[in-house]
Amino acid sequence: MAPILYMTLLSPPSRAVLITAQALGIELELKNVDLAKGEHRRPEYLQLNPLHTVPTLIDGETIITDSHAINAYLVRKYSSDDKLYPRDHSKRALVDQRLHFDTGILFNSFRNAAAPLFYRKSKEVPQETANQVVEAYRFLEAFLEKNKWTAGGEVTIADFSLAASVTSLDVLVPVDSLLFPKVTAWIQRFQELSYAKVNEPGLNDLKEVVKKCMA
């Protein structure tokens, strides 16, 4: 029986899990959670995930409610090697650091940038918030100074989460290729990965939503 993923395509963390599953060749049973209708706050969903967030993974008796934890779990359980989430302590620590950077900085920046448009009927991202996003891009540029990927020379689940967040942020606060050439090149490398295409439908949906909000 395929693992069940409760998700929504607009969500960067949900798309990060889809990217990981695609990279691993895992078939998931997808269940869309309509946040606009409050489906994430229904009692049956809260029993699975009291935090009422997406994504949530159910694999047999196992329930996991954070995208980074889900991706690490999928690699450990289903991958034939450890390339996407290395067992080496130093390499794994670097991947973990990048994942925490996504949680604390990048995805948090996305939420802060999107909230005024989605929930407060604003037609633009506040300048202070946009400045914080640019600062996040600056951190990422530094991570890529000596490496092809965000946690070293090989692609990892850190890239999947960060790419899902950055490509979404780029819709709200575009990445300046002159200021951030390494981030720009990294996005291009990511998009050339065959399994990265699973990020595109949700990203296109996000572009349409943002376009309507800014109109």
Per-segment meaning from a language model:
Residues 1-3, 211-215:
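Eukaryotic N-terminal low-complexity, Ser/Thr- and Lys/Arg-rich leader segments
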Residues 75, 165-166, 200:
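Active-site-flanking alpha-helical
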